[in-house]
Each structure stands twice: as C-alpha cells, then as structure tokens.
C-alpha cells in the first residue's frame, strides 16, 4: 500500500555484483564540501527505518562505507566510532558531519580549490571536444509589451487601464486641428504660444478632441462619460498646461451662462499665476471668466467676489479650495472638469484633507451622482504609480498616457547632463570648485548665463550665496577665477529668512534678467524645483545631490524647457555620491543620451587657498555680526 523507504545502506549492493568482464576499481576519494539537504533527509529516513536493528551494527556498516568513500584515518574513525556507540536515530547524519569537518580541517583551502578547478577542466575538455558555441543574437524586447518599471504598479488595478503611448516624433502643426478647434481659439494658440504641438499635446488632442466634439453635438449632459478620466506622465517643460487647457476652452467656448465648470488645482501660488496667464491668453476674445484663489488675497474678499460673479474656470491651491467649500463660496453642481497639476505632490500631502472633502461635495452638490460625471485630468512629470493614493479620486475608465520607454521617468529631450567628480580630499573647497566649474563652461559660452543652483537646505542656501559673493568680490586675486573678472556676476538666494515680497522680487529679477554678457545665479532649495516656468535658464547645478530620482527630474526640468537647449551639472563628492547617482540613473530615460563626465583640474595655487580661507573668515564675521544685531 505504501512505497518502501529509501535505505542508503543498500547503495553498496550494486558495487558487489559488478558485471563480468569489468575489473573492479576503487572509486576516487571525494570530499563533500557542502552537504545537500536531500542527502541528509534520505539518511535520516534510513536511520528511522533501521531503528529496530542494533545501533552498533549500523554504525559499523556506516564506518566501513566512510572509509571507502573518504579515505579517513584510523584516528578519525575511532573518534567517530566512540561517538556513534551511543544509540541515536541521527547517528548516521552526525557521524558523516564530523568526518567531513575533520577532513576539511586537514585539507587546505587551496587544495580544495585546485581539485575543483581540475575536475572542471577535465569535464569541460571531455564534453566540448574543442567545439565552440554558436553565437546567439541578443534578445530584442518590445517596450510596448514590457511590464517595465513605469508599468510595475503597486496594484493590479492598473492591469485593465487603457494605456496610450507616445514618443518625441509626435509633433504636428496646430493647423492640422483646424476642423476640431474653434477658429478664434486656434488663432490665440498660434499667436501667443506656438504653431507646432509638443508630443504630449498631440496625443491628448488626437485622443480627446474628436470624441469631445462629437459627444457635445449629440448630448452635452453625458459627454464626460464618453471621455473618461485621463492620467498623464510627461516630462517637465513638455507643454502639459496647454495640453489640458485647450480641450477645456474648446468645450466652454460656446457656453451661454457663466457657471463653475472647471477647477484647476495646483500646489503653489507661483504655478497659479502661470496657469492663469496661459488661460488668459487662450480665452482672448471670448466671454469666459477665469478666476484665481490664493492665500495672498483676503478670504472674505474672495468669498464675496466668487459669490457675486461665478467664474467658468477657477485656479486654486487645495487648502484654499477647502476654505471656499466650507464657506460655500462655490458650488460644484455644474462642474465638468477637474484638473490636478503636479498630482504626485498634491496626493502625498493632505492639505486639510482636500481630496475626501472635494469628492464628498461632488456627491452632494451634483444632481448626477453616477460615476463619470466629471472629467478628471491628472498631470505630473513623476506621476505616482501607487493606486492606493489615486483611489481617493474615484477615477472612471481612466486612460494612462505614457511615453514609449522602459524607464520610470523621462527627461527633456534637449537636456545635456554632466558629472563633476570631486575627490573627497578636495571637498572642503567645494564652493571654490563650483565657481571654477562655472568659469569653465562660461569660457565656451558667449551668451549670458542664467544659473539655478540647488542645495539641500535653507541654511545651505543662505551660507553658500554669501560665501560666493565674498569670493567673487576678491576674484581678481584668484588664478582659477580669471574668466569671471570681466563679467558681471549677480548672486542671490531664495530662502525663508526673506519675506515673501523679497523672494518674489528676487525670482522676478532672475526671470527677467537679460544681460548680454554676464552671470545671474539663483541659489535655492527644492521649493523651486516645481511650478517655476522660466524658459531661459541655461544651466541647473545640483550642488547637493537630490534625495530621489523623482526630485532629480523636477530639478533638471527647470532648464531645457519648451524644446530649448539646457544643461545640468552634478557635483559629486567621493565614491558614495557617485554610487548613489548611478542608482538614480536606473529610473531615468534620456532618449539614448548619457551623462558625460566633465574633467576639471582641481590643482589650487596658494593664492586660491588664501582667498578661500579669507572668504570663510569674512563669512564667519558676517554671521557673528548678524547674530549680535
């Protein structure tokens, strides 16, 4: 009924009855360096099966077998025999283990390695017979069919989501959409923005406009369900704002009565102003009303304004939106579009619980409470892949727009990146090396430079900006800073020690600075890595490395915007930061390009060292005087 168990003691039986004509030879000694789990299990089973036999006889058989297999000495065998004289169900396993350990102690590691290599060489020679393996072509993977990093979502909810891919070749003239767009809207686009689309604009307009126009002509009530919700992962500076603004203005172009039909939620006040400027240019010559709500304005005044004149489009931050919902300044009864820009940042922060509050009002304010009553458009350069965070938005038939790549994030197409590797011994001179690096790429650039430098903290921003100012004041004494002597250099810092008005003025001056030959430097933290649309930043420098690939994408995305050239420089100190940066690269798509090393001569003369030391002393005195004041 049951299969008989395996008895290792019977393994010697076939050897006794060898076929005739074959001369019996003693098998070569084999040293088992690593016991296999299956072997010990079989031996354990065998010891259980022979439990009714005397333990002494089994020990003697096992001892004889070990002497043949392993060539053990009499001294080792006697030790094992004494140990196995005690009856035990695991005597076989224990004796083999002790025998193996004793043999390994007597054999050197080099002998064991050489024996393994010799065996491997003999096996290879016997098996290959000087035959070479036929070369095989490299396996070609289709990115369209890959479950890549960007598609390795944290929930199976993404598996049934419609995915729409695009690439950098998808550029069209806006005139191709003459039959889909209102004539006045098309005129405003070509006049104020561009005559050609960006790839993300092309794919969204191709996917939405035909269905949108057809559905509006049939039934304005249910057009939101025909479109469904939209999620877009696109690089910074790729034209996302215009991509979602055009369908909104096209839909509301012929509206008769002003009602709140679109809410655009952004994370910062600076981004509010940029989106407002874009929509104002798009709606020129129309009766559409575009309003903003932000913390700088009086909440009471905004409440009065929104109650008296209901806008068609409202641009706000999540916290301010909650304030107006609580005060009943706005009603979502007629809402058709909900836009969430920089979605990953908004969804990672609660902002007074804005998301549950907004979804609750959509259920109570709207007469149509069925799913899909509002088109939700989610945009980000680093769109979250965590469906748990997106679940709170109650998405309806979402379409996910992705660049055709096997990476998690994509960088601007015209971005050039360089790594400046600083030896650990020279890290104390890092600010001086920063200025020297600027001298190097300014020597090959006849145009004015507008440089944005990212540091890790507010304190670092204040300290570095003042130190660079002190060094530049005495740059004539330095040999490495000779290229800066004839250039106007302006260095400022955006930090929390400044008032809001001061920071706003500094950013405005940096944005509108247009020296024909000079350097404008703005030092900041990651607060300016998002929502700053300054198209003529020539260089971004990561003085301190970012904490993640997501943060890196937003930093370097401040340059090479709107299909313009831009450069990013990474100052990496020692092997640790270089290794960390290599890990970041695994998530980034550069469209076939790579990060280039920038070789610099870090030899400093005595005059340079003295200049740096005196600047540090001046910085110390400055901070002491500031603290006393």
UniProtKB/Swiss-Prot annotation:
The keyword Cell membrane does not apply. Coiled coil: none annotated. One of its GO terms (molecular function) is RNA helicase activity. SUPFAM superfamilies: P-loop containing nucleoside triphosphate hydrolases (SSF52540). This is ATP-dependent RNA helicase DBP6. InterPro entries: DEAD/DEAH_box_helicase_dom, Helicase_ATP-bd, Helicase_C-like, P-loop_NTPase, RNA-helicase_DEAD-box_CS. Residues 88-103 have a biased composition (Polar residues).
């Amino acid at each position: 009924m049951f299969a008989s168990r395996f008895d290792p003691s019977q393994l010697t039986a076939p050897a006794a009855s060898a076929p005739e004509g074959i001369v019996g030879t003693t098998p070569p000694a084999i040293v088992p360096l690593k016991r296999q789990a299956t072997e010990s299990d079989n031996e354990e089973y065998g010891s259980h099966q022979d439990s009714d036999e005397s333990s002494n006889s089994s020990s003697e058989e096992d001892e004889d077998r070990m002497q043949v297999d392993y060539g053990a000495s009499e001294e080792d065998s006697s030790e094992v025999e004494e140990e196995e004289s005690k009856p035990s169900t695991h005597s076989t396993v224990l004796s083999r283990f002790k025998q193996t350990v004793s043999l390994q102690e007597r054999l050197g590691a080099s002998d064991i390695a050489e024996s393994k290599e010799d065996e491997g060489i003999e096996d290879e020679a016997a098996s290959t017979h000087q035959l070479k393996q036929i070369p095989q072509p490299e396996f070609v993977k289709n990115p369209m069919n890959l479950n890549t990093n960007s598609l390795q979502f944290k929930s199976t909810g993404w598996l049934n989501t419609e995915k729409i891919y695009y690439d950098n070749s998808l550029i069209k003239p806006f005139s191709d959409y003459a039959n889909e767009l209102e004539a006045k809207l098309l005129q405003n686009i070509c006049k104020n923005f561009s005559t050609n689309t960006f790839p993300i604009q092309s794919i969204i307009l191709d996917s939405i406009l035909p269905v949108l126009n057809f559905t509006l002509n049939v039934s304005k009530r249910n057009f939101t369900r025909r479109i469904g919700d939209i999620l877009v992962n696109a690089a910074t500076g790729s034209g996302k704002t215009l991509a979602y603004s055009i369908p909104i203005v096209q839909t509301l172009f012929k509206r008769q009565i002003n009602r709140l039909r679109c809410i655009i939620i952004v994370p910062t006040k600076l981004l509010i102003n940029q989106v407002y400027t874009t929509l104002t240019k798009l709606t020129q010559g129309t009766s559409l009303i575009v309003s903003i709500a932000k913390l700088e304005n009086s909440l009471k005044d905004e409440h009065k304004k929104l109650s008296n004149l209901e806008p068609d489009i409202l641009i706000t931050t999540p916290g301010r939106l909650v304030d107006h919902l609580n005060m009943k300044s706005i009603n979502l009864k007629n809402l058709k579009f909900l836009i969430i820009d920089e979605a990953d940042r908004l969804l990672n922060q609660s902002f007074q619980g804005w998301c549950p509050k907004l979804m609750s009002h959509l259920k109570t304010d709207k007469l149509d409470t069925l799913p899909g009553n509002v088109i939700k458009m989610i945009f980000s350069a680093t769109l979250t892949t965590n469906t748990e965070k997106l679940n709170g938005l109650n998405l309806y038939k979402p379409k996910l727009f992705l660049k055709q790549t096997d990476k998690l994030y994509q960088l601007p197409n015209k971005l050039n990146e360089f790594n400046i590797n600083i030896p650990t011994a020279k890290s104390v001179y890092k600010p001086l090396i920063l200025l020297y690096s600027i001298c190097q790429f300014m020597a090959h650039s006849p145009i004015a430079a507008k440089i944005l430098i990212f540091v890790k903290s507010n304190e670092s921003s204040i300290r570095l900006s003042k130190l660079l100012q002190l060094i530049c004041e005495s740059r004539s004494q330095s040999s490495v800073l000779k290229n800066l002597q004839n250039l106007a250099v302006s260095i400022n810092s955006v930090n929390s020690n400044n008032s809001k008005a001061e920071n706003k003025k500094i950013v405005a001056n940096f944005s509108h600075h247009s020296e024909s030959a000079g350097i404008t430097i703005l030092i900041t933290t990651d607060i300016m890595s998002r929502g700053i649309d300054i198209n003529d930043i020539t260089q971004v420098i990561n003085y301190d490395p970012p904490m993640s690939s997501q943060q890196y994408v937003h930093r370097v995305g401040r340059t090479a915007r709107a299909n313009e050239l831009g450069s990013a420089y990474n100052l990496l100190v020692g092997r640790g930061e270089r290794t960390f940066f290599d890990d970041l690269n695994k998530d980034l798509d550069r469209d076939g390009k790579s990060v280039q090393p920038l070789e610099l001569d870090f030899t400093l003369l005595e005059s340079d060292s003295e200049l740096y030391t005196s600047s540090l002393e001046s910085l110390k005195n400055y901070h002491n005087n500031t603290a006393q004041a």
